[in-house]
């Protein structure tokens, strides 16, 4: 039996990679517009990072992480999300000593042991932005505006933005007490995981995916009724900034996100009942990981889910021709000249393909057409003797005569 990719993973083949490159280039340009610079972190980290950052009682840590011991007996985890590693790098690199805010973006694979379903893989990829050092709600609004701009530029319609505030540790303590009082009436109906969460972290019960628990929390107390004045002012300011930016939103008091590090602002972008981007503020994570007390906010966007959305909305990503010129040849002498000419053109960043298969001229032209070459030319004995060759535009068949030796003139055709 032939070997296959592990369940929940997917190869990115050359026929699809242009879509990723298109999105990545667009994301990079938009991130640069906001003053963000790229960060790259390891694909695995010490398990403690996610236990402390994401939270011991979360589904991510309890059920979804790929964790193993290395040969030295250290507990290692393939990263299940991008924020904690970015914060760890920020702290370890002592970037908090630099002028703030620090703005960074990343593309990263993330691994979670989840049920494989439409738009959900065990290895997927995220585009994320993290901004450290700014506590004003205006930066929350700016971060939210980035996915808004991405969807608008891609032509994706029907995306809903839901926002909430989950307060700070001070006001969340009061809310947790009210939540536990409410949940205690239905304690016996909670799933085994949520019974454990009841004392350790009742807020996580709001994020449970079990149907009985989802039904129980429908009438639970609303956290917005319990947040302190500072958190309320921050949330009201955020709404004002979103209004100024003409960003439509809906307040959803039951958004808590599945990661413990969030505080104050949380948000989700939803289309057809599927979350395609999410994030929020995490003002205590930097200190939790060993850095100074410093505010932060960010988001993660699933690239596979975005591509699926584009496909479902029949939004096509333009495929650029990856070959500028197909250089055909007739005979061994011509093949040598084609090799030399291709090298000269490639040195000038003209994308060339030549025949290595000994195909007939007819087969070479058929291949040139199949790979989407913009132009083609065929060198044979006559072309070598005269120094002239017909350059054919594949789109419409129009031909012009060019001098093989006049490289600069030839280059101008492609620029």
Curated annotation (Swiss-Prot):
UniProt EC number: 6.1.1.21
Enzyme class: ligase
Single GO term (MF): ATP binding
Reactions catalysed, as given in the entry: tRNA(His) + L-histidine + ATP = L-histidyl-tRNA(His) + AMP + diphosphate + H(+)
Subcellular location: Cytoplasm
Gene3D superfamilies (alphabetical): Anticodon-binding domain, Bira Bifunctional Protein, Domain 2
SUPFAM superfamilies: Class II aaRS ABD-related, Class II aaRS and biotin synthetases
GO cellular component term, pick one: cytoplasm
Sorted UniProt keywords: Aminoacyl-tRNA synthetase, ATP-binding, Cytoplasm, Ligase, Nucleotide-binding, Protein biosynthesis
Origin superkingdom: Bacteria
Chief localization: cytoplasm
GO BP annotations listed: histidyl-tRNA aminoacylation
InterPro entries for the chain: aa-tRNA-synth_II (IPR006195), aa-tRNA-synth_II/BPL/LPL (IPR045864), Anticodon-bd (IPR004154), Anticodon-bd_dom_sf (IPR036621), His-tRNA-ligase (IPR015807), HisRS-like_core (IPR041715), HisRS/HisZ (IPR004516), HisRS_anticodon (IPR033656)
Protein family (similarity comment): Belongs to the class-II aminoacyl-tRNA synthetase family.
Subunit structure: Homodimer.
Protein name: Histidine--tRNA ligase
Organism: Clostridium botulinum (strain Loch Maree / Type A3)
Gene: hisS
């Amino acid at each position: 039996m032939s070997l296959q990719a592990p369940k929940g993973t997917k190869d990115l083949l050359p026929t699809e990679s242009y879509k990723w490159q298109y999105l990545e280039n667009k994301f990079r340009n938009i991130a640069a517009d906001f003053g963000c610079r790229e960060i790259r972190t390891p694909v695995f980290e010490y398990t403690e990072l996610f236990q402390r950052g994401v939270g011991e009682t979360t589904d991510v840590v309890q059920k979804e992480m790929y964790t193993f011991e290395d040969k030295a007996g250290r507990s290692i985890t393939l990263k299940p999300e991008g924020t904690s590693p970015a914060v760890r790098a920020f702290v370890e690199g002592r970037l908090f000593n630099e002028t703030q805010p620090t703005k960074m973006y990343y593309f990263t694979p993330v691994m979670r042991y989840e049920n494989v379903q439409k738009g959900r893989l065990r290895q997927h990829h995220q585009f994320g932005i993290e901004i450290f050092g700014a506590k004003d709600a205006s930066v929350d609004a700016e971060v939210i505006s980035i996915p808004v701009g991405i969807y608008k530029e891609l032509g994706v319609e029907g995306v809903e933005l839901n926002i909430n505030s989950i307060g700070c540790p001070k006001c969340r303590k009061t809310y947790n007490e009210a939540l536990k009082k409410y949940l205690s009436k239905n304690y016996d109906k909670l799933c085994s995981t949520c019974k454990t969460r009841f004392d350790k972290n009742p807020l996580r019960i709001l994020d449970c995916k079990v149907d009985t628990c989802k039904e129980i929390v429908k009438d639970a107390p609303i956290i917005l009724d319990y947040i302190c004045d500072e958190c309320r002012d921050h949330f009201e300011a955020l709404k004002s900034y979103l209004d100024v930016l003409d960003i439509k939103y809906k307040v959803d008091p039951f958004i808590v996100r599945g990661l413990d590090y969030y505080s104050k602002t949380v948000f989700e972008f939803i289309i057809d009942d599927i979350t395609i981007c999410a994030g929020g503020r995490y003002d205590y994570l930097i200190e939790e990981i060993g850095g100074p007390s410093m505010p932060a906010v960010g988001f993660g966007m699933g690239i596979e889910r975005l591509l699926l959305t584009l496909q479902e909305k029949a939004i096509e990503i333009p495929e650029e021709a990856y070959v500028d010129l197909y250089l055909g040849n007739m005979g061994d002498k011509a093949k040598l000249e084609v090799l030399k000419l291709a090298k000269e053109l490639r040195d000038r960043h003209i994308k060339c393909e030549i025949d290595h298969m000994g195909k007939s001229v007819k087969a070479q032209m058929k291949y040139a057409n199949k790979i989407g070459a913009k132009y083609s030319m065929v060198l044979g004995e006559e072309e070598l003797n005269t120094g002239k060759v017909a350059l054919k535009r594949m789109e419409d068949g129009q031909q012009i005569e060019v001098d093989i030796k006049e490289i600069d003139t030839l280059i101008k055709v492609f620029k």
